[in-house]
From Swiss-Prot:
CDD domains: OTU_VRTN
Listed name of the protein: Vertnin
Organism: Sus scrofa (Pig)
Keywords: Developmental protein, DNA-binding, Nucleus, Transcription, Transcription regulation
Subcellular location: Nucleus
Family: Belongs to the vertnin family.
Domain of life: Eukaryota
Length: 698
């Protein structure tokens, strides 16, 4: 036994002893020591001594499973050993025998331990790999495997790493990714034409984590026991070599074999072209020979040459951006578009944010420093020399995030429409992510009540109240008021911005239709979703005195002017708002805001009707409804409020029951049952359920 083999065995023994300790701390410490030992000698470029050339034997079981879309003129070979034979197959492909399988196993364990975050979350293909890990536990796609949480996958990863320290253990998909990084080569993972639903996650080219040169490609096949014409059970890996290499090996048995001449990675366009080489094939022909489902056949048929070329270009562009990021910086947009003009700007920025958020490179330093800056430092950062910090986009995003956190710290929730008016470049999803994080950091936050006296003028006042000034802006406005300050730049316009012309026109049109009495409440909510329900009832309460108030406005118009008319209208709406608030305040205990525990869930599944909710609300009162506003309008107001409350409670109960039964509905299904509930409300309730909150008690 050579000194190299003794060192490898010693490293494996130390790793096996560290496995017995709880957690991964001891194993990570042993991996750091093993890395120092293994870095003292590199992997050989060819076989050094050892036994003579072995007789190559074709694996008949793997050959019967060899797929049609795999590279031609290649044969799977028999590999001797125990377990899944992944490291033995790689050693045989590179050095002609399995002598270095233990060293490859040790190096792979070190790679997986020291770069655990990368393989679970950091790389571009991490979602595909994790999905493949879910399906590797079964022979076909199932809902149980699809819904495995990330914590379970991390536990499986840790268990697989510990098991890899021992010979004869079985390997998984992330072992292929780690082995590709250890060997600095691409691995062509060949998967049989079985288990068609999960095959795309396994039949793919796996690239190393980092590589400074154009890597060669190893071909390794998933082999095992065929169950039916459609299914097979994976048992081991088989090395795949070209026919020329087999002939050269048998022709030069007296000479020491050299490493096989590995073929370069085929371009993505050629790889995708193998799926549908003959577009004239019929479904019946493919169904008889390859057991292809009808949906898969028509999906392949729709993939034209142009579509495959676009997919190949996108594939190459994504990996080009990843390689440039690992070399120390992201390629600028103009340079990227010159190389890949087919890729859109939004796609480029999406990939860029994905790479910056992975946390696997030192390029995140400027972003982390920017997160720690205060508002004044962000303003001073505009003159910074670093392009990552001084770019306008980064400064704008940091300003928007700090502004939202500042408003929430002042117990004020900024609506998205007001936030977007101030920061038009921030998407809705980014806004809600920032708002959720800010709310978690402020547990004492208490939102304002929905029904208030000033609710009548909500569309005109929400935007003005929500846009609170910054600390620096307060000083600027004070200086401007005293006459000693400089005029504010365009970013710091006065915060009390008037509504745009189309919003005013929309509001006037809605008011006119409500006052005319031809617009019911349900149609008002569908036609004007941006206006609050309290606004409708304020206008509805003014409908009785509309001619008298209109004549009064016409009489006062010559003396008051336009501003006076608006003040009179606001005064009337405020007075009506007080009446509406009094009408919507029934005795204590009469309104039930949550669904009862014994409520039949079938009613929620079928979509609750408005009439049923009204009848239940009236029965709960036990007496005729009498509104403070008087007359039919006040009664309709209270009945509609009861219906809205019951409707929202049933929607919450429906989502909570479906969440508990692990069959959460999509927004399309939910909106079919509850059409008046906004999309943002659905996602807010969904996020609350997944965060562990309860929507309805009982």
């Amino acid at each position: 036994m050579t000194s190299r083999e003794q060192l490898v065995l010693q490293v494996l023994q130390e790793l096996q002893e560290a496995v017995e300790s709880e957690g991964l701390e001891g194993l990570v410490g042993a991996a750091l020591e093993a890395k120092q030992v293994l870095s003292s000698f590199a992997l050989p470029t060819c076989r050094e001594g050892g036994p003579g050339p072995q007789v190559l034997e074709v694996d008949s079981v793997a050959l019967s499973l060899y797929p049609e879309d795999a590279p031609r003129n290649m044969l799977p070979l028999v590999c001797k050993g125990e377990g899944s034979l992944l490291f033995e197959a790689a050693s045989m492909l590179l050095w002609g025998d399995s002598g270095l399988s233990l060293e490859l196993r040790a190096r792979t364990v070190v790679e997986m331990l020291l770069h655990r975050h990368y393989y679970l979350q950091g790389m571009i293909d991490s979602k595909v790999m994790l999905q493949a890990v879910r399906y590797s536990l079964c022979s076909e796609e199932s809902p149980e495997m699809t819904s495995l949480p990330s914590a379970t996958l991390e536990a499986i990863f840790d268990a697989d790493v510990k098991a890899t320290c021992f010979p004869s253990s079985f390997s998984n998909v992330w072992h292929l990714y780690a082995l590709a990084s250890v060997l600095q080569r691409n691995i062509y993972s060949i998967y049989p034409m079985r288990n068609l639903k999960i095959r795309p996650y396994f039949n793919r080219v796996i690239r190393p984590r980092r590589c400074d040169h154009m890597p060669a490609t190893l071909h390794i096949m998933w082999a095992g026991q065929p169950l039916t014409n459609h299914l097979f059970r994976h048992q081991y890996f088989a090395p795949v070599v070209g026919l020329e290499e087999v002939e050269a090996e048998s022709a030069t048995t007296s000479l020491a074999p050299t490493p096989p001449a590995l073929a370069p990675l085929p371009p993505p366009a050629k790889t995708l072209e193998l799926l549908s080489q003959d577009p004239g094939l019929s479904y019946s022909y493919l169904c008889e020979r390859y057991s292809v489902t009808k949906s898969t056949f028509y999906r392949w048929r729709r993939q034209s040459q142009e579509h495959r070329q676009k997919v190949a270009t996108r594939f190459s562009a994504k990996h080009f951006l990843q390689d440039s990021f690992h070399r120390g910086g992201v390629v600028p947009l103009q340079q990227f578009l010159q190389r890949f003009p087919e890729i859109s700007r939004s796609t480029y920025y999406a990939w860029k944010h994905e790479l910056l958020g992975s946390g696997t490179c030192q390029a995140l330093g400027p972003m982390e420093e920017l997160e720690k800056l205060t508002e004044e430092q962000v303003a001073e950062g505009l003159g910074c020399s670093s392009p990552a910090v001084s770019s306008p986009g980064m400064v704008l995003m940091q300003r928007a995030k700090l502004y939202l956190e500042h408003c929430i710290s002042l117990n004020t929730l900024v609506p998205y429409r007001c936030f977007k008016r101030r920061f038009p470049g921030i998407s809705r999803s980014t806004y809600y992510n920032w708002r959720r994080k800010a709310l978690r950091r402020n547990p004492s936050f208490k939102p304002a009540p929905v029904l208030s006296v000033a609710g009548a003028t909500q569309p005109a006042s929400v935007g003005e109240k929500a846009l609170l000034p910054w600390e620096g802006e307060v000083g600027e406005e004070a200086g401007k008021a005293t006459g000693g300050g400089q005029p504010a730049p365009r970013e710091f316009l006065p915060l009390r911005m008037p509504l745009s012309r189309w919003q005013r026109r929309l509001r006037r049109e809605a008011r006119k239709q409500v006052l005319s009495g031809h617009l019911p409440f349900c149609r008002f909510r569908l036609r004007y979703p941006s206006l609050s329900p309290s606004t409708f009832w304020v206008w509805k309460s003014l409908a009785r005195g509309w001619p008298r108030s209109l004549s009064k406005l016409h009489i006062q118009a010559p003396t008051l002017g336009k501003g006076g008319i608006q003040e009179v209208e606001e005064k009337q709406e405020k007075e009506a708002g007080r009446n509406v608030t009094a009408a919507m305040a029934p005795p204590a205990g009469t309104l039930q805001m949550t669904a009862s525990p014994g409520e039949d869930p079938g009613a929620a599944l079928g979509g609750p009707s408005r009439e049923g909710a009204l009848q239940e609300g009236a029965m709960a009162q036990g007496r005729p409804m009498v509104a403070a506003a008087g007359g039919r309008d006040g009664q309709v107001l209270v009945m509609d409020m009861l219906a809205t409350t019951k409707f929202k409670a049933q929607a919450k109960l429906f989502l909570q029951k479906r969440f508990q039964s692990k069959s959460f509905p999509s927004y399309k299904e939910f909106s079919a049952l509850f059409p008046l509930t906004a999309r943002s409300t659905y996602y807010m309730w969904k996020r609350a359920l997944y965060d562990g909150l309860t929507l309805v008690d009982g």
